[in-house]
Each structure stands twice: as C-alpha cells, then as structure tokens.
C-alpha cells in the first residue's frame, strides 16, 4: 500500500515538477493479476485498480491488517467502474457481471471481494475508489443506461463533454462517495474549464481512453498559484479541496472522477472565473 500524506497549499506551491508528481500523481493503476492501492490521508480515500488476466484477483484479509480491521470494507464503502473488457465481481458469493463502463457500488461490511475477467486477451480493468463509511447500503450495479447523461460546453471553446453520474444521490445512496465518468467529444480538449474548487470535498481523476502519443496537462493548485502535471493513459491524480482540477489534452480523452467529503451535492462548487486564474 502506497501512503500519501496530506499537504498544505503553501507547501505545495514550493514544489518542483518531480515533487508535485510524487505527491499527487498515481502512475501505475493497472498491473496484471494484481490490485494496486494508494491510501491518501486527504479524506482517507483509497484509490487503485484491479486487472485479472490469468486468474481471479481477491482483496482479502491482508489489506485489513494494514487498515487496523479484518477486511477492507469493515468500515468502508467501495465504488468500482470497469474501463476494460467484460468481467465480474463476486461479493460474498454473489456474482455481478460488470461489462465495459458498468459500475458496482459495494456497501460497508462486505467480506469476500473477488474480481475476474471473461477473456484474458481483453481483461477487465476495475478502477476503484474506497471511502470511510458509517453505515451499510446495499450493493448495486449501475450501467450507463441507468444514468442520465448531461452534455456541457461547446465546440467553440473546445470543452464539449458528456458527464455520466454513476454514484450520486439521484441514482443510489452512499455514505459519502460520489463517482462518475466524463467523455470529451471528438476534437475537444478541455475539461472543467472554467474551473472550480470545493472546500467540502476532495477529488481524484483517472484519465484514460488516450493514445500512446497523447497526454493531458492536468491543472492544479490554488487559483492564483496554478501548476500542472503531465498525465498519460490510465494514470490518476489526487486533488485536495483547495486545488483546482482541470485539464487540457493533445487529443480528446475520457476520465473517471471520484469525490469524498462531507457534501454530496454535485453543484456544491466554488467557481473560479478564467480571468482570475494565475
């Protein structure tokens, strides 16, 4: 388990490129036949990926020991979105078939967590966010057909994008975790611009659906102290509540967003005008 400490905004603005990447970038999300796990002190979120190829992958009691409990979800909830091939997640003996861009919410108290791919040649890529939970909500599958996509932006400003809200109060109940998927229209490059912060939540982005010769310049930092991190395909970045989180790519891309904190109202944002950025 890779543990990342919280960092003050005054400290963050003094960091060079390598130090920024070390603090906020998660480079290796998917490793064949393993799970990856990054524990952030910021709102205690855990971020990672699971890619079963030659055999199922189980998250067992070995993780619980690192968290001071018996199992991962003794005091946590889990959200998973599959950005790879078809697969399944077995939760306490019950199999949930999870296709490409399907999602599964798993509530507090689940013990058995096994992840499988249908085809080794096109393995599932289960990306997950895990947050502290105070009560147990039912495990539930959410498919793209279950969410009402919202299209924002304009081709003229190169930010036309479709937002799919998977885990929000209108779709299902969670303790604090919100997750969704945003896809840029072809030829569009900007996400979340004009940008915002939200004092009551932190956020993690996973960028994917990117070609090998493309990248995203992820903007972060306080609005008057902006920095950037260069992102490649299937990499994630941690955004503290004091930081903007926006990006511009060399080509269109898709990203999964996940938020934890005290407020699940999606529009609870502190907007920043473009002319106020530095």
UniProtKB/Swiss-Prot annotation:
Keywords: Isomerase, Metal-binding, Zinc
Enzyme Commission no: 5.3.1.17
GO MF annotation, one: zinc ion binding
Cofactor(s) named in the record: Zn(2+)
Broad class of enzyme this protein falls into: isomerase
Origin superkingdom: Bacteria
Presence of the UniProt keyword Ribonucleoprotein in the record: no
Keyword Repeat found: no
Catalytic activity reported: 5-dehydro-4-deoxy-D-glucuronate = 3-deoxy-D-glycero-2,5-hexodiulosonate
Pathway involvement of the protein, from the record: Glycan metabolism; pectin degradation; 2-dehydro-3-deoxy-D-gluconate from pectin: step 4/5
GO BP: any one term: D-glucuronate catabolic process
Binding-site positions, Zn(2+): 196, 198, 203, 245
Co-factor remark: Binds 1 zinc ion per subunit.
Function of the molecule: Catalyzes the isomerization of 5-dehydro-4-deoxy-D-glucuronate to 3-deoxy-D-glycero-2,5-hexodiulosonate.
Protein family per UniProt: Belongs to the KduI family.
Protein name in UniProt: 4-deoxy-L-threo-5-hexosulose-uronate ketol-isomerase
Primary gene name: kduI
